[in-house]
Amino acid sequence: RVALAARKHLQTEFSPDEEIVCVTENDACGVDAVQVLTGCSIGKGNLIYHDTGKQAFSFYSRKDGRKVRVVFKMALNREEHSRDVLKEKILSASDEELFDFTEPADLPPNKARLFSSIVCEECGEMAPEHKIRLHDGRKLCLGCFPDYSRGW
């Protein structure tokens, strides 16, 4: 429902390239529908995960500058209703009953960049240059880079 509502607000269809961008604030199952119905994907660089845990999605059209933030607002009490009842409520509600529509405060994210690959000097696997760290003069991937934490 989020993806269809966003497409309606942006007056667009499926995006085969990077014309539509989605910033999702959760990693729940609704993100799967966003990928299928909008064409946004992590691999193409036009689906960006910004973890706030909210059922909120910001959509941007690079083609014409339209944008919309869609936030799920319907209160669903899982203790009072079965899964089937909740599903029916979601499917039968209007977009306005389900969602708040506002304009995102942020600018659209930049287009995806391509980076050179660097060989990790510890494991021998390649990683993009922006994910390589220097440790004692050696280029290490994030998996081989020793954790450095001081508690904050």
Language model regions located:
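Short Cys/His-rich Zn2+-coordinating modules
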Residues: 97-108, 122-127
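Cysteine-rich micro-motifs
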Residues: 134-147
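Short cysteine-rich clusters marking metal-coordination/redox-active sites
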Residues: 120-124, 141-144
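Short, non-ligating residues that shape and space the ligands of small metal-coordination modules
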Residues: 129-130, 150-151
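Phosphate-handling active-site elements
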Residues: 9-18
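Conserved phosphate/anionic-ligand binding catalytic regions in large, soluble enzymes, centered on
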Residues: 1-6
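Short, flexible, mixed-charge glycine/proline-rich loop motifs
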Residues: 107-117, 130-135
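A structural-propensity feature for long, helix-poor, extended segments
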Residues: 19-59, 63
